[in-house]
Swiss-Prot record:
Species for this entry: Homo sapiens (Human)
Subcellular localization: Membrane
Domain of life: Eukaryota
MF terms in GO: ubiquitin protein ligase activity; zinc ion binding
RING-type zinc finger span: 227-277
Protein's name according to its UniProt entry: RING finger protein 175
Keywords linked to the UniProt accession: Membrane, Metal-binding, Transmembrane, Transmembrane helix, Zinc, Zinc-finger
Residue ranges crossing the lipid bilayer per the database entry: 51-71, 83-103, 104-121, 149-169, 180-200
Gene: RNF175
Amino acid sequence: MAAGTAARKAAPVLEAPPQQEQLSHTKLSAEDTWNLQQERMYKMHRGHDSMHVEMILIFLCVLVIAQIVLVQWRQRHGRSYNLVTLLQMWVVPLYFTIKLYWWRFLSMWGMFSVITSYILFRATRKPLSGRTPRLVYKWFLLIYKLSYAFGVVGYLAIMFTMCGFNLFFKIKARDSMDFGIVSLFYGLYYGVMGRDFAEICSDYMASTIGFYSVSRLPTRSLSDNICAVCGQKIIVELDEEGLIENTYQLSCNHVFHEFCIRGWCIVGKKQTCPYCKEKVDLKRMISNPWERTHFLYGQILDWLRYLVAWQPVVIGIVQGIIYSLGLE
């Protein structure tokens, strides 16, 4: 009788510690959980200093070699480099989006891809419709302005968070910083995609019309009242104020529709006349300083292009080398 009572009293004592441990894990905050994971990671990698040095050296060597190969490829075969980079820019984020369940980015990516695919389809048709160039340049000019606005808003949100201005609006620093980073990434990513697709459409349309060729002379002569970008007649005179758009004249005396030449130079990254290939003076063509192409913005887009398109490839090569060498 006494032995049975002692056994019943001892049973709860043996089951109590796991229950307390389980409750303690459920009461951990997000910060405590993160600290616990860091402690486990530190214990796992303790004493592997030489191995970590080897992994860092492998990463740096692959990074330098990849940079040299990409630069040489871009200089020798720029067209194929741009096409492969654009394809990776388009596909690589889709993989990470599906893997990490970023449905908001996936919906925006899908909408942008559908509309841009339709625009690209219209731009590559032969014969080219007279309305297609205007449609193409208006779409990509809209993408350019929206991406630029998102980039500026994201940058300002990050700077305001770092300065502590988010406290005036009772916004958590993590929320405002996340908003700034996401907005900045959206602006830069779609800015890169829009500019690259606009360049492809510009080459196809201009060569189809016949007033422009990438490596040869124009196949058609240009009249004084014809736009070399869209091939349509110019109605508004140079000294007149148009209701929808004005007429621009370059330093080579060739005239164009406002939307056509803006899309050609600003969105399509073309710095030459569509007909005679003379260098375009953007400061003379665009008087508003806020609409001028910023070289720093273009460099940031190039950096993001490398980060999104080629950095995952470099990391994949490094992981393959590390796995083949047996480094953990």
